[in-house]
């Protein structure tokens, strides 16, 4: 077993997060390597490190850690245990979205994520065979709505002149969900850091002020009574071509 740590930084990262990643790797005890992205936009920062990790034939699991995560002690061992014991192909830890605040994962009643951030996510190497390249893309905005006890998932194609942030993680997770190999939700949560005050460069005593969010104030779920059809994709002919879902 070898862990490929994928850090999709666009140029900055909290030193505490790096410290926690190394702590977790040492505690887990498996072989590992870290793959970096520097000064690349979304989704390139995700695709670059994914390609690097998969190019190493010894890497068995890709651990995505975004640059602002708060990793509790034992999180890597805990999530790897869940992945192996349950035979999952991917597992994600929920964490608070600081601007809301709320959790970052929508899950079905069986614990599968159909809408998920990837701040702390482990993906088995074999899971990527269910997706076509590019594995990460941000040209689709997803709109979720409840319609007659169905979750309607409607894509909106992003035009070149539109301003959009993210969605690469949503498309990645939703593609796996529709393939029947969803990202499962870990029972252990992470936190998120945010820089609230930049240290004054004119004083040695002026350090950066960083706030940590660790409480999930809102659990996002979608449940129906005795209905196995938990998700329904809107009827768009070219949807598979646009999100690269393979049969």
Where are the regions that the model predicts?
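N-proximal low-complexity "stem/linker" segments adjacent to membrane-targeting elements
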Residues: 1-36
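A short, glycine-/small-residue-rich helix N-cap motif at loop->alpha-helix starts
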Residues: 40-45, 165-166
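Short beta-strand-to-loop acidic/aromatic patch adjacent to the donor-nucleotide binding site
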Residues: 59-70
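Conserved catalytic core of nucleotide-sugar-dependent glycosyltransferases
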Residues: 72-152
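Short, high-confidence coil segments that cap the C-terminus of an alpha-helix
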Residues: 58-59, 86-88, 181
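Active-site nucleotide-sugar/metal-binding loop of Leloir-type enzymes
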Residues: 47-61
């Amino acid at each position: 077993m070898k862990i490929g740590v994928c850090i999709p930084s666009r140029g900055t990262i909290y030193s505490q997060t790096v410290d926690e990643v190394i702590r977790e790797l040492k505690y887990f005890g498996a072989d590992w390597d870290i793959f970096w992205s520097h000064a690349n936009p979304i989704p390139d920062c995700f695709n670059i490190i994914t390609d690097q990790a998969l190019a190493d034939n010894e890497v068995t699991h890709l651990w995505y850690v975004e640059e602002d995560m708060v990793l509790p002690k034992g999180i890597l061992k805990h999530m790897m245990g869940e992945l192996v014991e349950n035979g999952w192909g991917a597992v994600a830890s929920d964490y608070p979205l600081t601007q809301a605040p709320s959790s970052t994962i929508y899950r079905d009643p069986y614990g599968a994520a159909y809408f998920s951030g990837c701040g702390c996510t482990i993906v088995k190497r074999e899971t990527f065979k269910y997706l076509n390249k590019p594995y990460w893309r941000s040209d689709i905005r997803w709109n979720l709505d409840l319609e007659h006890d169905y979750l309607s998932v409607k894509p909106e194609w992003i035009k070149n002149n539109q301003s959009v942030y993210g969605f690469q993680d949503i498309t990645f997770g939703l593609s796996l969900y529709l393939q029947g190999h969803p990202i499962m939700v870990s029972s252990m949560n992470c936190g998120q850091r945010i820089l609230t005050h930049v240290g004054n460069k004119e004083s040695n005593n002026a350090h950066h002020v960083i706030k940590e969010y660790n409480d999930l104030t809102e659990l996002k779920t979608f449940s129906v009574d005795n209905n196995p059809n938990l998700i329904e994709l809107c009827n768009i002919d070219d949807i598979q071509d646009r999100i690269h879902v393979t049969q």
